């Protein structure tokens, strides 16, 4: 069993997962180094990755890519399949609150991180990506830019409602958008 956490925010990391080790001694935790930095876990608790680092064993490999918030995103390769967990990688543009210069800077950072992933792989079997309506009218901008750049067979995203609860969605290649 592998447990990954992309960063220390409570919607992405809960310390209670460390207790699972009592039931599953074979568990391997792979965490972003910012979790250690923010003292949410101890050094001996996990394998710690920052952008550009990789963990590999006989079952899988995990490469850490960047984020446009904190922590990392993960590319997981297992049995010739590629899974991408974006963490908080998104085009956090906040167009309705930011100046044009600010949101274009946010977008540039996002596209740079997507290009870094593209330089490593052009295609994903599954991508898990945050979608947040708080971004306003353009809340799908980041996800659309992502799938336009990187061929993605299945795109899964938690859509946060106005109360912050998650409503997971999944689209396969060829599906029509009908959120």
Residue ranges and their predicted role:
Residues 7, 14, 62, 88, ...:
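Divalent metal-coordination and catalytic microenvironments
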Residues 12, 136, 164:
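Short glycine-rich, flexible loops that bind phosphorylated cofactors or substrates
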Residues 127-138:
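Conserved Switch II/interswitch segment of TRAFAC-class P-loop GTPases
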């Amino acid at each position: 069993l592998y447990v990954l956490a992309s960063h220390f925010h409570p919607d992405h990391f809960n310390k209670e997962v460390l207790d699972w080790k009592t039931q599953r001694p074979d568990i391997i935790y792979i965490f972003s180094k910012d979790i250690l930095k923010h003292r949410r876990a101890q050094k001996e608790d996990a394998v710690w990755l920052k952008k550009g680092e990789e963990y590999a064993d006989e079952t899988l490999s995990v490469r850490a890519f960047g984020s446009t918030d904190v922590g990392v995103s993960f590319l997981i390769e297992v049995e010739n399949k590629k899974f991408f967990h974006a963490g908080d990688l998104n085009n956090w543009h906040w167009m309705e609150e930011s100046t044009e210069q600010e949101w274009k800077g946010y977008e540039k950072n996002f596209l740079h991180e997507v290009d870094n992933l593209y330089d490593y792989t052009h295609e994903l079997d599954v991508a898990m990506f945050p979608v947040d309506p708080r971004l306003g009218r353009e809340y799908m901008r980041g996800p659309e830019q992502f799938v336009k750049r990187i061929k993605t067979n299945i795109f899964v995203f938690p859509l946060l409602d106005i109360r912050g609860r998650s409503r997971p969605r999944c689209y396969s290649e060829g599906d029509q958008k009908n959120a």
